[in-house]
């Protein structure tokens, strides 16, 4: 029925957290995905594969990701949601984007192209969509965040850390997702980048595992810049409006609370 709700990706990190705190009529994963076919929903939460399983894990098998993405695209028309909350990555957006920045049309990176394809088709076929673009997920699993995984469980070698020291990271805690989405839905906005203040690799090392600071290598001109995306809707969370949902000081305190020894 049209007032029923569904969560696609219920057994994932985001899904477990969200569905334990909010009731959904249908908890969907790949094993029972077909039961959504032919149904209408008042609201559906839809997790992109990279958000559900981790960007690093998905990148490790892009062919499987392409098959999964194409399967989902081919069956979008079989599901009829009134409102779709699509939780995806920022890979289809430039590194300094906000919600007014057009998404990329194509990419030479097949992983990014899969994100683009599902984003484009879902928004084309469904009428009312809230796109939630996560810059970087603060999950210490190497599938989600190799940097956090290394800082919390480093090897015992003296070799330099395999991360650019000045690269920006915008770490988004999964625990925020339900509250942030609940705040966005009444606004009627089509997209939100829940942007956290950017922290460099060096800042994160000193914050979460200072003993590794001596293993930071020197910066190189070819190093990635990282993410410094902002939100035009940040004033809904924080005043004055600076593009971020929290202050840098609060972000650092939260990361220390969850991840510092």
What is the predicted role of each segment?
Residues 108, 116, 120-176, 182:
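NAD(P)-dependent short-chain dehydrogenase/reductase
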Residues 86-99, 110, 137-142:
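Conserved catalytic-site region of short-chain dehydrogenase/reductase
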Residues 5, 32-96:
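NAD(P)H-binding glycine-rich loop region in Rossmannoid oxidoreductase-like domains
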Residues 46, 83-86, 130-136, 193:
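Structural signature of the Rossmann-like NAD(P)-dependent dehydrogenase/reductase core
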Residues 11-13, 48-53, 90-93, 136-139, ...:
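Short, solvent-exposed loop/turn segments at secondary-structure junctions
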Residues 2-24:
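N-terminal Rossmann NAD(P)H-binding glycine-rich loop of SDR-like oxidoreductase domains
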Residues 178-239, 243-261:
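Mid/C-terminal beta-alpha module of Rossmann-like enzyme folds, strongest
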Residues 22-34, 38-46, 61-62, 82, ...:
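Active-site regions of enzymes building and remodeling cell-envelope glycoconjugates
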């Amino acid at each position: 029925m049209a007032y029923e709700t569904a969560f696609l990706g219920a057994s994932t990190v985001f899904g477990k957290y969200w569905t334990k705190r909010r009731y959904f009529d249908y908890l969907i994963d790949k094993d029972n995905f077909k039961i959504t076919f032919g149904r209408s929903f008042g609201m559906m939460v839809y997790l992109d594969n990279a958000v559900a399983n981790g960007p690093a894990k998905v990148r490790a098998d892009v062919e499987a990701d392409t098959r999964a993405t194409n399967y989902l695209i081919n069956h979008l028309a079989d599901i009829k949601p009134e409102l779709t909350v699509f939780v995806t990555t920022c890979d289809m957006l430039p590194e300094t984007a906000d919600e007014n920045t057009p998404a990329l049309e194509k990419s030479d990176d097949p992983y990014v192209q899969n994100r683009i394809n599902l984003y484009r088709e879902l928004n084309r076929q469904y009428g009312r969509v809230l796109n939630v673009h996560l810059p970087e997920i603060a999950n210490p699993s190497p599938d989600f965040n190799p940097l956090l995984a290394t800082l919390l469980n480093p090897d015992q070698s003296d070799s330099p850390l395999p991360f650019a020291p000045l690269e920006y990271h915008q770490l988004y805690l999964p625990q925020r997702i339900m509250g942030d989405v609940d705040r966005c839905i009444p606004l009627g906005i089509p997209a939100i980048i829940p942007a956290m203040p950017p922290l460099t690799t060096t800042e994160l090392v000193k914050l979460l595992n200072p003993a590794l600071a001596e293993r930071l290598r020197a910066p190189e001109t070819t190093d990635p810049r990282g993410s410094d995306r902002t939100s035009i809707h940040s004033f809904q969370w924080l005043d004055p409006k600076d593009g971020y949902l929290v202050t840098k000081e609060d972000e650092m305190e939260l990361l220390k609370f969850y991840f510092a020894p």
